């Protein structure tokens, strides 16, 4: 009956207004796109509570166990010296477990980030179960198609999605935490856009 308990818990969460729910917005920096052969370089997250981004509760962690940075430093500025001062993936997952328990996980391109996290959890025998999963990329894709607009190439990048809501452009070099913040800002803009009489249920984000 565990599946039924989980289903009911998810249903309850979906009925909440976004401002009533606790969310955790997360981003990863990676060495590549395939969790079977590439690695998590860094993890950044911050909560949204009562409809506000809690920047003071933000966390940023670098994985000291990365074995091959490849071209990663070009994109996020993390080099071997920075990695050496990081933390083990097990430590990072333990921190994430504490931060994410009882919250809705939000990512931009959720299948990518959640896929890498699940691979890391399997490797380190850790289980983290968010209350619900929300993907700002999938939400934006749905909104564009519902409005009858064509889906242009690169229309769903984080930068392109932010631009549609008049949010400022990101710096050319950014990290997991700055991207998590950018995703949190995007989510709140999306919520405002789809709200009716200022109200939006979590179900409308999934």
Where are these regions (language model features)?
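Short alpha-helix plus adjacent loop in nuclease-associated cores
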Residues: 134-152
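Short, structured secondary-structure boundary patches
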Residues: 103-105, 151-153, 188-196
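Acidic, divalent-metal-coordinating active-site segment for phosphoryl/phosphodiester hydrolysis
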Residues: 175-186
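Acidic two-metal-ion nuclease catalytic site recognized across multiple nuclease folds
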Residues: 1-15, 164, 184-206
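Conserved non-catalytic scaffold segment of RNase H-like nuclease domains
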Residues: 3-26, 30-131, 152-174
């Amino acid at each position: 009956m565990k599946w039924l308990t989980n289903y009911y818990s998810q249903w309850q969460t979906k009925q909440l207004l976004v401002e009533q729910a606790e969310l955790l917005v997360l981003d990863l920096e990676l060495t590549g796109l395939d969790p079977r052969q590439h690695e998590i370089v860094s993890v950044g997250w911050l909560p949204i509570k009562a409809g506000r981004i809690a920047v003071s509760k933000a966390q940023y962690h670098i994985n000291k166990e990365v074995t091959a940075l490849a071209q990663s430093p070009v994109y996020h500025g993390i080099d071997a010296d920075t990695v050496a001062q990081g933390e083990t993936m097990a430590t990072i997952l333990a921190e994430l477990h504490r931060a994410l328990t009882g919250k809705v996980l939000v990512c931009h391109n959720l299948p990518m980030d959640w896929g890498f996290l699940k691979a890391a959890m399997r490797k380190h025998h850790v289980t983290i179960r968010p209350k619900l999963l929300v993907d700002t990329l999938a939400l934006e894709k749905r909104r564009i198609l519902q409005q009858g607009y064509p889906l242009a190439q690169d229309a769903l990048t984080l930068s392109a999605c932010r631009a549609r809501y008049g949010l400022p452009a990101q710096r050319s070099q950014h990290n997991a935490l700055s991207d998590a913040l950018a995703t949190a800002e995007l989510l709140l803009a999306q919520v405002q856009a789809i709200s009716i009489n200022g109200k939006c249920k979590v179900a409308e984000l999934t």
